[in-house]
Amino acid sequence: MDHDTPPAPSPTVPRDRTIGRAPRRPSRRTRGRTAALGAAVLAAVTGALPAPSAHATPPGPLIRADTDRDGLLTPDDDAGKAAWTRERGALMLPNIDDDQRRCPVAGPAGARLPDDRLADCGDAADPVLDGTADLADLAPVRITAAPVAAGATATVAADPASREYVRIFARRHGRMVPLGPGDRLTAGELRHGVRLGVEATDFVRDPAKWAGFTDLVLRVDRDGVTTEDRVRLRVAPLVFQHDLMPIRRMMTADHTTGPAELERGTPYDPAARPRPVKPGEAEFRRDLRRGLDRAGLPAPLFNYPTGGDVWTQDLFKTAYASIPAPGGREHRIGVIVRSADVMPGTATPDFPLRDASRSAFALLRGPGTGVIQQYDPGRVGSDDSLYYGSFSSTGNFGTLPPYTWRGHRYPVGRIVYGGTAGKESPDVSFTRMLAAQGYQRPLAVDTSWLGVGHIDEFLSFVPARNDRGWVAVVADPGLGRRLLEELVAQGRGDEPLVHGIAPGDTEDPGLTVAGALRKPSLTRGTEIARKGIDAALRTLKEQAGLTDRYVVRVPALFGEIDLPAGYPRRDLVANYLPAAANGVSTGTGVYLAPRQHAPRTAGRDVFERAAERALSGTGTRISWVEDWAYAHHVGTVGGEVHCVTNALRGLSGTRPWWTERD
C-alpha cells in the first residue's frame, strides 16, 4: 500500500565527527557472511536463472501468478511463467512491515533488546496474517478451477532451496491460512479453484544463500497419475528513494529524548516541537521551517529521538519495495535501512550499531513500513571501525535520480556511494546486499580524501529543466578560491574571511581573505579536494553519462586536516566554510543549503550569490539555512544541512522499478 503519512508513534513504545503477538521466531534477516558469490551474484543481478526443463502444459488445474506484471491474474500470465526475466516474471513483496504493531521493542521489565533481536521481527516472521493490510501485502497466485475426479488431491510448495524464505497462504473455509508442503488440497477445492497468496520473508541479502527466486510447484494426484505445473517468482528489490521525490516529512534530531525512552514505552509525538538544547539548534530549526514553507511543504518537522546525536542522515536511508497492482499502479511498503556503522569504543556484540538508529524500530516500524539492518559482526571491536567506520554511515549513500543513457534505462535511479576497493569503503556485507538487489546498480566513487569520507560532502541532486530532469550540485574548490582572489584584486584582502560569526567560534580567528589564500592548509586542501572531486566526476561521466551539462558547480573552500602522528589515513580534508553542495532537495523546486558566511559585496554573501547564479537556470531556488553552530562547527570535520536531516519522501509518482533495463 502507499502510505503517504508516516505511521503514528506506538503508544507503548555518531557519525564520528571527531576523527499481542507472542515473541517471534528469528527471521534470518540481520547478518550476512563474506563468501564467494560466483554464479549466484550473476543470477541475482541479471535475473536469469535456468528454467526447469520444458514440459507440456498439464491438463487440469494450473498455477497462475502475475507473470505479465499488470496486477491481474489472467490467461495472459501463463506463457513463460516457469521462467523469469527482467522483462517478464511474477513478483512478491518481502513482507517485513508490522501492520498490527505487534513487534516488541523491549524485553521483560523494559530490558533493552539486542540489536539483532530488535530487528528480527516483521509480519513475515510468523505464519499469522495481521489483518487486511497484511493480506494486501501477499502476491496474488491462483490455482485455476478444473473438473477433477472425487479422489484427486494436490499440493503446492516452494522449491526446497527457497522454502525457508517463502510462505504460501491458501483461502480455505473462508479465510487465508498457511499452506505447508505436505498440506493437501481436496478435489472440491480444485474444482472451484484456489486463491493463494505468497510472501517473501526477507530481501536478498547474500546471493550465495538465496538469490531471491522461488519456484511454486503444483502437483496434482489423480487416479495414481501425478501431473505438475509451476510458476517462478522473484522477491521485489530494495529501492532507495531519490531527491526528485517530494518530501512528505522532514526529519531532524530531538535531543531531549533517546531511543531507550521510546523502547520503555514513553509516549512520544514526533510533531511536538522539542526544546532546543544544542548550540544553534533554534536557528537551524527556524530556517529549516522557513525553507519548507517556501517549498510548499507545511507539514510539521518530524522529530526523531536521538538522545544527542545530531547526524540524522547517518542513521538510516529511506527506501521502499513494490509489486504491480491493477491499473498500472504499484503496491508498496516503505523500508528504513539502518546504518551499518559499527561504533568505535561503544560497540558490543549485542549492541554493535549506532544507538540513535534504534529509534527507527519504535517510531517508524509499523503499518506499511519495515526496518532492516545488515552489517558484518566481525567488525565489532576492530580498530578499523575507528579509522574507517564512518564510510558505513548512510550519509555516504545517495541516489542518482532516474535517467536513460546509451540504451540503459534507470527509472528509479542508481545508488551512488563513497568507497574504494580498500578499507576506505562501507561495510562489505551491506554493499553486497545492495548489489544483490539486481536493480539501481550501485556505483562507487572514491571519497577517501575526505576526513569523514561521505559523498554528501560534495555532491547532491536537484530538479532541473533539462532532458534528464535534474542536475548534480557539485562543490567546486577552484571556484571558491577564484572568488577570494577577486576580492583581493578589489583591494579587500584585509577583510575577515568568515562573516557573521564571532571570531572565537571559527577555526582561525582573525583570518583574512588574503590570509586564506596564503594559508598552507587551505591551499593544500583546495588541491586535494579538486583532484578528488574531478576523479569522482570522471567516474560519474564514464559510468552514468554525467557530462558538464548535468553539473552545477557551487563554490567551496576545503582545508587540510591536521592529523595526529600514527593516524593511518593521510591527506584528508574537510569543508572550511559551510558546503553549499551538502544540502537537501525538497523535490518541489527548493534546495535547502547552509548559509555560507563568506565575505560580502554590496550586502550579499559572495559564495551565496555565486551558488544562486549557478542554479538560476535550473528552476530550483535556494533557501539558506543557518547551521554553523549546530552542524558545521562541530567536531573536527563537522557537517551541514543534509548531514543533520533525513526525509520521508512521497512515492505516488514513482515509475516501476521493473521497467529498468541495465
Q: Could you say what each language-model-derived stretch is?
A:
Residues 1-56:
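Secretory targeting and sorting signals
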Residues 57-662:
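Histidine/cysteine-enriched polar flanking segments
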